[in-house]
Every structure is written in C-alpha cells, then in structure tokens.
C-alpha cells in the first residue's frame, strides 16, 4: 500500500474547503501513521503552467506547510486532473513496484480526487478513500458539502473505491 497525497498545495488548502480543520487533522494522522509503519507517502502536485502563479517555483504551488514531504518522499507533477495521466509517471512508478493498493487523500474532491480515483480503478488499483481526508470548495452547481457527500457516499463506494471511516483507514495502514 501507498498513501497518495494529491494537490495539497498552499494555493488551495484554506478555510474555503469543506470541514477544513477535520480535513487537515485527518491528513496529518494518515501521513504520520504511514510514516510510522514504513508505508510510502507519495505527493502529487498540480502545475497550471508558467506565469499562472500556480507552477513550479511559486509559493502557491508548494505543498501545504502541515503536510510537508520528507526529503526522501517522491513527488509527481501533473497538469491535468488525474494523477495517473502518463505525463506524471505515477502509474509507471506504481506498476514497477507492483503496488496495487492506493490510499488517497487531498483535494479537490470533485476534480482531481475524483479523476484519480476513477483512473486508478480503471488501471486495476484498489483505491481506498478515508472519510474526511478529501475536500473541495463550493462551485456553481453544488456546495462543498454536497460535493463531498455525493462522491464519498454515492459515486465512489461499491463502484470505484473502498470509502472507509478514518479509524479503519488507520488500521489498514498498520497492517
């Protein structure tokens, strides 16, 4: 198993996210438990391209201060919603390691987390989604709360991912 931390970057990790404090606390718990158990923590960062303010070298691009990677932890860069798009190299990396179980956390529930969950499933990976370890902001169609519940409680379970309570996620990291 690996823990995949998706797009938890300075420019978008803030109070606009649904259940912000719970989200931050849960990701910190997951990262801590994974490291304690020797489970690889992998970071994915979204790059909107040069001169956008959200690209390599920009403060907004950097991983959120409370989730900082260790020097030896892998980082993959993407420019589309799915972390498994060929350009990132993530799928090839996991395939080479023969890794099939991916616990995912990060943002945005309705964009990059959804795309990565569905793509991971399509590539034969077991995607595990801990409760309140992904989040999003309001959009013109749904509130952040509606979006969170739609994906975590309706779309993903029994289709694309194992959506598990936080205590179960922590147990899985200890196996």
What do these predicted regions represent?
Residues 1-2, 29-32, 54-175:
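Active-site-adjacent betaalpha module
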Residues 4-7:
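N-terminal nucleotide-binding beta1-loop-alpha1 segment
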Residues 9-15:
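Short acidic, Gly/Ser-rich segments with clustered Asp/Glu that frequently serve as metal-coordination loops
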Residues 11, 49, 135-136:
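Active-site loop signature of alpha/beta-hydrolase-fold enzymes
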Residues 16-47:
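A short alpha/beta connector and helix-capping loop motif
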């Amino acid at each position: 198993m690996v823990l995949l931390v998706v797009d938890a970057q300075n420019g978008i990790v803030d109070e606009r996210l649904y259940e912000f404090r719970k989200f931050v606390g849960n990701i910190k718990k997951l990262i801590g438990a994974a490291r304690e158990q020797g489970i690889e923590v992998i970071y994915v960062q979204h790059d909107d391209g040069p001169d956008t303010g959200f690209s390599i070298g920009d403060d907004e691009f950097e991983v959120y201060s409370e989730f900082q990677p260790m020097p030896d932890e892998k980082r993959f860069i993407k420019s589309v919603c799915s972390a498994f798009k060929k350009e990132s190299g993530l799928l090839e990396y996991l395939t080479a390691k023969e890794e099939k179980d991916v616990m995912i956390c990060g943002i945005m529930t309705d964009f990059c987390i959804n795309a990565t969950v569905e793509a991971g499933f399509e590539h034969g990976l077991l995607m595990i989604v801990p409760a309140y370890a992904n989040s999003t902001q309001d959009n013109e169609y749904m509130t952040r709360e509606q979006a969170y519940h739609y994906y975590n409680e309706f779309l993903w379970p029994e289709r694309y991912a194992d959506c598990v309570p936080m205590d179960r996620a922590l147990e899985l990291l200890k196996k």
